[in-house]
Regions:
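Outer-membrane beta-barrel translocator/channel fold
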Residues: 1, 151-183
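Outer-membrane beta-barrel translocator domains and adjoining extracellular loop/strand segments
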Residues: 31-38, 87-95, 136-142, 167-175
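Transmembrane beta-strands of outer-membrane beta-barrel proteins
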Residues: 15-23, 73-77, 123-125, 154-156
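Short loop/turn motifs that connect adjacent beta-strands in outer-membrane beta-barrel proteins
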Residues: 6-17, 68-74, 119-120, 149-151
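Structural signature of outer-membrane beta-barrel domains
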Residues: 7-9, 24-31, 82-86, 130-134, ...
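Residues on the lipid-exposed face of transmembrane beta-strands in outer-membrane beta-barrel proteins
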Residues: 2-10, 61-67, 110-116, 142-146, ...
Length: 183
């Protein structure tokens, strides 16, 4: 993560202008092995060792410009690029499944947020919307916090979203006949 301050609030300038960027890479692996088929799970496609491996690699690049002043509040505008590669290696049932199937989603999102305190009210808005790519999800979060007497407050929250794809549902395969999504 990096943050650069282009201008800072002082007696002449009315606000702060910052640039922020972040690069994140994650690699996840899951391995399931069984020396032989277990009758508890029902019938299987083949009566041999089960050796499944699942891999998820994610590259997440985020950049934003942030402006903060007493009059306007805090405004952020940015872009997020996500590259997900998800694959399954299932060695026991090559004849039944296409093990070469790989999910490779590359998506760019537009991010915007706004925060402002007006007397006893805090207003927070966050949005992330699909621009182009494979993952057509978006979300909008809003929050209004009202300060009441003493240490009490009242919060109203609203969220609307279209979710990201469930990679497990899209790709999941099992050696057991009853544990596949498309039976």
């Amino acid at each position: 993560d990096q943050k650069f301050s282009l201008s800072q609030k002082d007696s002449l300038a009315g606000g702060n202008l910052d640039v922020y960027n972040s690069i994140y890479f994650q690699e996840l692996k899951y391995k399931f092995q069984q020396s032989s088929v277990n009758d508890y799970f029902g019938q299987s496609f083949v009566q041999q060792e089960i050796n499944d491996k699942i891999f998820l690699n994610t590259l997440n690049i985020f950049g934003k410009v942030s402006y903060k002043s007493d009059g306007l509040g805090a405004i952020d505008l940015g872009l997020r690029y996500i590259d997900d590669r998800y694959r399954l290696e299932n060695f026991a049932i090559d004849d039944y499944l296409d093990n070469s199937k790989i999910i490779n989603y590359k998506t760019t999102f537009l991010n915007a947020s706004y925060k402002k305190r007006i007397k006893k009210f805090d207003l927070i808005l966050n949005a992330e919307n699909f621009l182009f790519g494979d993952n057509k999800s978006s979300k909008l979060d809003s929050e209004l916090k009202i300060d009441l007497k003493k240490d009490n407050f009242l919060v109203f929250k609203y969220r609307i979203s279209s979710t990201a794809p469930n990679y497990n549902h899209i790709l999941y395969r099992s050696n057991y006949e009853k544990y596949n999504w498309d039976n």
